[in-house]
Structures are given as structure tokens and as C-alpha cells.
Amino acid sequence: MVELDFGGVKERVITRQEFTVEKARRLLKNEVVVSLGYGIQGRAQSLNMRDNGVKVIIGQEKTGFHAPYFDLAVEDGWVPGENLFSLKEAAKQGTIKMFLLTDAGQMEMWPVVKNTLKEGDAVYFSHGFSIIYRDQTGVVPPNNVDVILVAPKGSGTSVRRNFLDGSGINSSFAVNQNYTGKAEDRVKAMGIAIGSGYLFPTTFEKEVFSDLTGERGVLMGALAGIMEAQYNTLRAHGHSPSEAFNETVEELTQSLIRLVDENGMDWMYRNCSETARIGALRWRNRFRDGTTPLFESLYELVATGEETRIVLEKSKAKDYRQKLADELKEMGNSEMWRAGATVRSLRPKRQKQ
């Protein structure tokens, strides 16, 4: 591990320079990795491992709403009956079981997977949800297996895309149960094999608490909510849809957030007008102080398991997928995002095509 300074706090991280792909391949040479689920993360992680020379088997159902994922696996070169099986058949094989189904799917499939585990196997997660909220999920591994986690800091699409362009994506990793004594090596090897650039140590609990808070907060929920609030305010005061969208979303995604990505928030502020900078610095404090109680409430609901209860209740409902489709359709058909589609079509780079 190397020690790095994060805002004055020293943390130790794993680099792929010290823990190379070759080392990961050696450690995994006698392992057979079974990916249970070929969704967004399952596909990306499985393809990256296959490309890195790891033996991988896919478990994916092929009927109903599962069919597109099975068909995609076949398109990607997985062969039915050879390295592509149903979930139940795949679960019987391998030494490292990657549990990459949805959280609700993990609950449903766990009794089957648990009965296939052999002494010394490893159960691999990319989210601490099922383990930390075991009282609600029922996912309790036996004592004679390793329980490990690698959580990429991005979507499966980014995991695969970054792997293909050679950049990789950072991930956090954790060991919840080390029966064999080699769980640390296993989890690091898996992290590098799926294409991680750096591996950050964490715990299952810290991973799931921060992940659920982030998704409901700045990364998705708060981002969408505050965008809608500003857009609606501008529209209510007579601004056109294009103007409201440009000042709410387009300038952020096409300019400002790229400056933050390059060199930090202060860099972005330094590269804005004086008027923008003075106002933003003043209102930053008001937004921070105004939203902190909301974030505290959110974190409390995550920590107590209330958010988990809601997720499981909604995802198990028979009409869940239809309600989800309706909600996303409503969002996509809102004036704001229909205006956004037109604005995006007018970007110069698209006009050149």
C-alpha cells in the first residue's frame, strides 16, 4: 500500500503498479469466478476479468425481462452450456461467487446460492447492502467461506469503458469474513482484475452507508431535485425553457463541472467572472447550511435501515417495474428534460456530424 494525503488525513491505498494485473492473474489462476447476474456491473466486471485472463462463468436467466441480458451475454461471446448457464446451474460451479444481482434479487436467490457454497469458497459483493442489512435481507453467509467486496466508484458502463481505454476506475474494497486466511489477496486480485486503478480500503458498513447517502443526495436525488427547483423558478419568472435549461443544466455539464473535474472547485471559481464568483461564494454557505439538516436526516434513515425497508418493499411489489417505467417516463417527458433534448441536439459537436 502507498500512503496518500487526503485533505490532511493520511490514508493507505492499493495501486495497480504495486499489485499488478500479472499478480492478480497468478493469485486467481486456480479460481473459477462465477458472475451471478449479467446486468450493468455483472457484464462489465465479467468482461474485464475475461480480458485479463481470469476464468469466468456467467449465471443469467433467459426468459421474461431477463431475456435481453442473456441475449447480450451470447452476443458478448459467452457460450450456453460452456460458460453461460442459468443462475441455479452457475451457482453450483466455481470458487468465487460474484453476487451481482439487484439487492432484491440477491434476497430471492440467496437460499439457492447458500446451499451451493463449499468450504473455502468466497462470496463477492459490489455493495454492502445485503450483508449489512441482513436482518431484512436474510443474506447470512456460513462461517466457512470468505466474504469480500469490491465496489467500483462508477456505473458498470464506466467500468467497461474505462477499462477499454486503459484508464481504469477506482474502487473500494473490504473483507467481512476471512475464513481461508487469503481473503485479502483474493479481494485485491479481484479488484485489479475487474479494472480498478486504485483500491481504497473500507468496510461493508461504511461502503453501504456512504453509497446510499450519495445516491439519494448529491449524485442523483439532490442533483435532480435542485435542478428542477431552479428550472421551475426561472420558468415561473418568465424565462424561456432554453434559457432556464442552459442556466441550470447545460452550463454545468458542459463547462463548469469539467473545470471541477480538472482541478477542483476553487479552480472552477477562479475561472469564472468576478460577479459569478462573489455571488457563488456567498450563496454556497446558505445552501450548505440549509441542506445539512436534510443530509443528516437522510444519513439517519440509511443507518437505521429505514431506507432499506423502503427499497425492498417497493422493489418486491408486483407492479414495481411498471411504476418505475411510469416515473421515468414522467421525468423524461417533463418540459425541462424535453427542452434539454433540444438543447443537446444543438451542441456544436453534434451539428458537425
Functional labels for PLM-detected ranges:
Residues 124-216:
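Rossmann-fold dinucleotide-binding core
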Residues 65, 73-132, 140-155:
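Rossmann-like NAD(P)-binding element
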Residues 44, 50-78:
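NAD(P)-binding Rossmann-fold cofactor-contacting core
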Residues 30-49:
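Glycine-rich adenosine-cofactor-binding loop
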Residues 1-32, 175, 195-202:
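Glycine/serine-rich phosphate-binding loop and adjoining beta1-alpha1 elements at the start
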Residues 32, 54-58, 146:
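Residues at the starts of beta-strands that form the adenosine-phosphate
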Residues 2-6, 11-18, 236-353:
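NAD(P)-dependent Rossmann-like dehydrogenase/reductase catalytic/cofactor-binding core
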Residues 181-236, 242-260:
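Active-site-proximal catalytic alpha-helix in oxidoreductases
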